[in-house]
Amino acid sequence: MKYTRVLLKLSGEALMGSQGYGIDPEIVHSIAEDVAKVVASGTQLAIVVGGGNIFRGLKGSAAGMDRATADYVGMLATVMNAITLQDGLERAGVPTRVQTAIAMQEVAEPYIRRKAMRHLEKGRVVVFGAGCGNPFFTTDTTAALRAAEINADVVFKATKVDGVYDKDPAKHPDAVKHDHLSYQDVLSGELGVMDATAISLCKENNIPIVVFDLFEPGNIGKAVAGEPIGSRIGNPV
């Protein structure tokens, strides 16, 4: 099964590679090359990017910042990542538009659903920045929301691990990977894949989620082609 329209969720942490902070140009280049191949095959691709490599609202809140203020700072961090991704994608020959949920017309278009869909139909990648524009909502929830709005076939959550495990594989060598999970399995199991709001939105709109390793070259293309990589979350077959 080949997906026609895909929403790719990238965490901010994924962009920093092994640096511990900021953006690794090599990672951006690698992602751009993979995305270029996928778009050339005819797949429509939208991206939601996080901002945790620059600023994380929850950490700011824990350090004493007002939670809403911290979340707004985090949203601005996602815009920095979105513009950086746009640059990398366009250098790889992929026409790209950035749309933000907070207006900043000098650097990006405002988020307009119908315009985003038109860009996708014309073969452009759309990178969504500034989360959903509201504090207290994660970028995972934004990914689920935008996927529903643009009628995406699937949400890809590209991460540092190759799927969903019953416990953290970095800490537990005996962790077991799940190939298939229902939305309810994730909600009741507290597996930490996405927050409950994001999972619930996907469940309500019957949008499957595929979790896979971003750093394995070609994985985005394999996921688009429907190859059995990572872990798939959806309704029971």
UniProtKB/Swiss-Prot annotation:
Any Gene Ontology biological process: 'de novo' CTP biosynthetic process
Means of activity regulation: Allosterically activated by GTP. Inhibited by UTP.
Coiled-coil zones: none
Leading EC class: transferase
GO CC annotation terms, alphabetical: cytoplasm
Key words of the record: Allosteric enzyme, ATP-binding, Cytoplasm, Kinase, Nucleotide-binding, Pyrimidine biosynthesis, Transferase
Reactions it catalyzes: UMP + ATP = UDP + ADP
Pathway: Pyrimidine metabolism; CTP biosynthesis via de novo pathway; UDP from UMP (UMPK route): step 1/1
Pfam families listed in its UniProt record: AA_kinase
Binding site for UMP: G51, D71, C132, G133, N134, P135, F136, F137, T138, T139
Localization per Swiss-Prot or TrEMBL: Cytoplasm
EC number: 2.7.4.22
Matching CDD domains: AAK_UMPK-PyrH-Ec
Gene Ontology molecular-function annotations: ATP binding; UMP kinase activity
Domain of life: Bacteria
Main location: cytoplasm
Region feature (Involved in allosteric activation by GTP): 17-22
Residues reported in the UniProt entry to bind ATP: K9, L10, S11, G12, G52, R56, T159, Y165, D168
Family indicated by similarity: Belongs to the UMP kinase family.
Quaternary organization: Homohexamer.
HAMAP family: PyrH_B
Role this protein plays: Catalyzes the reversible phosphorylation of UMP to UDP.
Protein name: Uridylate kinase
UniProt source species: Synechococcus sp. (strain CC9902)
Recorded name of the encoding gene: pyrH
